[in-house]
């Protein structure tokens, strides 16, 4: 426990807890800032857009030049799916029986194949952020499946950090006597994880990006089974607009939400 406590930065932890509790309290009293649509000038729609092919070409050229990488947020376990394995190992009941990791690996392979039409052999490095509970089983799963046909040298595993579990009163919780309870620090832990060595004594992800000449990263969550990994149209828009970050969304066209329930046979609309 002493070793755990020595690794905790009290000032940083206090800031995190304070901000979390303030945000929670504001949400309870509806004091949080209203969410407004982004400015029109910051939006680009590629649905039926004659410029979509133009953006795709930009994205493909960057991919062919080795400037595009893919970053997967895969620290979660499939507990809500009834599985203790990493989410990416989960069989989503497709006829093929392919896991989420398998589907995404195939899409990277296809992207490399398509981009190779614009130049020599193309490599799209795949950076996979795991967590303490998921790193070992994730790496084992990839080895057992031959990295789904990808070159292991271009699949880089790294690990997000952890934070002590804190009560609503701001007190550090114990997992058991003499052991601090900890949990992965969420997707926000990505930025620190990018700077940390992928393994002890090895370079960081940022070092690897620099070595490979990767300028653009497409980041996504592991449970997005429909993701267009390294989508050249999306990457092309971001490159052409010279933006530091971009978000790809499905535009909401109706104020109601459709959902299904085991308790009802009909689709229901909720405002």
Predicted regions and their residues:
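Positively charged, low-complexity/disordered segments
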Residues: 263-265, 269-271
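Poly-acidic low-complexity segments
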Residues: 1, 6-9, 151, 230-231, ...
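Domain-scale recognition of functional cores that engage charged ligands
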Residues: 40-69, 80-264
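ATP phosphate-binding P-loop of adenylate-forming
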Residues: 71-76
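Low-complexity, highly charged intrinsically disordered N-terminal segments
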Residues: 1-47
